[in-house]
Amino acid sequence: MDVIKRSGAVQEYDPQKITGAMRKAFASVDQACDEAALSGMLAQVERAIGDGVRTVEDIQDEVERALMAGGFYDAAKSYILYRQKRSELRAARLTLAGAVNAKGMEELLQGIQRDFPEEEYALTTLSGKFSGFLKAGMNRSEALSALVKAAVELTTQQAPKWEFIAARLLNFSFELELADELENRGIHSFYDKLRCLTDEGLYGAYILEHYTREEIDEAAGFICPERNELFTYAGLDLMLRRYVIQTHQRVPLETPQEMYLGIALHLAMEEKNDRLGWVRRFYDMLSRQEVTMATPTLSNARKPYHQLSSCFIDTVPDSLEGIYRSIDNFAQVSKFGGGMGLYFGKVRATGSSIRGFDGAAGGVIRWIKLVNDTAVAVDQLGMRQGAAAVYLDAWHKDLPEFLQLRTNNGDDRMKAHDIFPAVCYPDLFWRLAKENLDSPWHLMCPHEILTVKGYALEDYYGEEWERRYLDCVNDARISKRTVTVKDIVRLVLKSAVETGTPFTFNRDAVNRANPNGHRGIIYCSNLCTEIAQNMSPIESVSTEVVTEGGDTVVVTTTRPGEFVVCNLASLVLGNIPVEDDAYLHELVGTVVRALDNVIDLNFYPLPYAKITNRRYRSIGLGVSDHMLAKRGIMWESEEHLAFADRVFERINHAAIAASSALAAEKGSYDCFEGSDWQTGEYFTKRGYDSDEWKALAGTVAKQGIRNAYLLAVAPTSSTSILSGTTAGLDPVMNRFFLEEKKGVMLPRVAPELSPATYWYYKNAHVIDQSWSVRACGVRQRHIDQAQSMNLYITNDFTMRQVLRLYVLAWECGVKTIYYVRSKSLEVEECESCAS
């Protein structure tokens, strides 16, 4: 006997489907039914329908009669209601498919119905919402947009999975429009698309120069379209608006999966062995949303101008030529979408001498205002204005004015509202802040110290810095601007509460943990406070007039110094089985290799950046995560601290092992000899004394390490949205909130929000911040660079409470603090470091 399905298709009769349906009917009313009764009812149904061809509806009618005849009235009622509900769902599905009238729409809706069977995600609900947006005469695109909007607006704290349904609908709409565009262009394969994009100057020619057509075709087979279902609506919407390749008329020509594959092709193109194998591994880690690369890498890999790095750090020299060179460096970096950290601690203070003339110097503020204007003038690829953090030491004579750069009161000629101030603190400052706020604090000019004492105070740290600082304080030849620690603390906290800044850089903690202290010092961090690498200023050597080819040219020679570059990626811990050590090591090994490849494949906006990046081969592997909530761990708990300690130790072990293996294959970074990696001090300082760690230390000493710096936790504000996770190390601001985008309110839901995870998501502003600080201290032991850690405060906080958090952070060994986020304060996120 054959059965005609509702679609019109014919299939062979299967009695198991009938008995299965009856079992479900009995189970739904908690009623038992023995096999004999089931067999009897099945026989009754089969006698009634006889041989030949029957419809599904005919058979289901007979099942109802058999249940009633057997006296199973409750089960029969449940079965009837089930049929009615299924009928309503079919009607809703057909209504929606008919309104859109696109091939594949009904299959998409069937998939949604299958994957989201819960009552709150019924297609009848979607159809009801959609009917409110439906208008006569809508075309296909308009109807799909209305359907997406309906799903978005159904997203609530109680029904969060609508954001995944909305994403599927958005992707369907996008792929329909893309298919029309590709058809018009005659593009029928991935290779055709790469050829077309390359010809239009949208794709780097180097991809097709490195891979044969056969390799491109094989790589195209790696694409898994079903991984689009991992996107939330917010993530996919952001991906399509900002990251996939678009024509000059802003028409997208690349799918998210093709974007991931294009990045993988770029990052693997110089691999000598198993190149396509690495393409696949890079593609898999990205498309499974286990790893996110930094925004510049996601945006620019595979493109002609492949600037892949996030942030840059420059040491501003104390000379007119050097200051303007640093400002020009910032302009060049900003032009290609990078953010900047600028250390102004060497620049002479207001009233200092110039060429022996006392009182001639105007101080750092006027130069910082030039940085501010450059940030506004040189926007990031026309998308947003440039961004720079400027760092100044806590003992610099211009510090009080510096701390008022962004505040709302005072002389506007001394303001720079578009840059982000940051202060570099020695241990002595926090020790005095803890013990006696009325202690004197002496502010001095670095140029005056260098002139009188013959050394730069900022070139030292720890006990040696403190000894020299007191030596300067006691030297009557050096002028001082003496205030109390309380005066500085008051200015810092006032600015922090009003503006979220200054950022905090604990210079002694940073430099004590620097594995490359044998080669220099770390003066400051970057725009997002997660990078800590050796720095030194660019120096002018000579300027000569020479003749070349009959032309007179001016040749300026410079010594490149150490111009820091950040190459970032993040592990999405909520999407990774972190308890599986083998899996974690393999994944970390893959992303470390990808980041190391970035160094060689990068387009550098400045030669200084290229020189430093290839000298140290520094990378910054970080995390973004909803790992704790997913595992049922409360933020404010010792379990949190213990779990973070274990996980970050394993990540660190995996990263070091991977980098050392790369060194065995490709060689160590240039400055390995004499480093803490080579001497073993890196492991001793962190108390890594288990047999496993001792073995790894021995391996590193023997075969080297590829990357001078390995771990740095960036804020990941944008890329965390792509991967549907929480940003960086932060707790959630709210479990559910509405965000306005282009006049539309978009719902945002905490990742994997459910009754099981609900109570593990606590609003960042009501969390006891001491737990966040302590957790940061626990993680810091395993992170050789720093972490973008925010403090969240409310209007109820007193200044003394905020100060206690700063002091606690210093006591816990926290290297940097990013924003102080007041509940009423909006701060600007760094897009570049969104890894």
Give the ranges of each region predicted by the language model.
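Alpha-helix capping and helix-loop boundary segments enriched in small/acidic/polar residues
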Residues: 6-13, 100, 251-254, 273, ...
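Core nucleic-acid recognition elements
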Residues: 9, 31-261, 277-283
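Terminal amphipathic helices with adjacent charged low-complexity linkers/tails
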Residues: 78-79, 83-86, 162-194, 425, ...
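Catalytic alpha/beta core of large soluble enzyme barrels
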Residues: 212-220, 224, 228-237, 529-533, ...
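Function-dense linear segments that define catalytic or interfacial modules
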Residues: 245, 251, 263-275, 279, ...
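Internal maturation/activation junctions in enzymes
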Residues: 285, 303, 587-608, 633-716, ...
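Polar, glycine-rich mid-to-C-terminal structural blocks
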Residues: 404, 419-492, 496-499
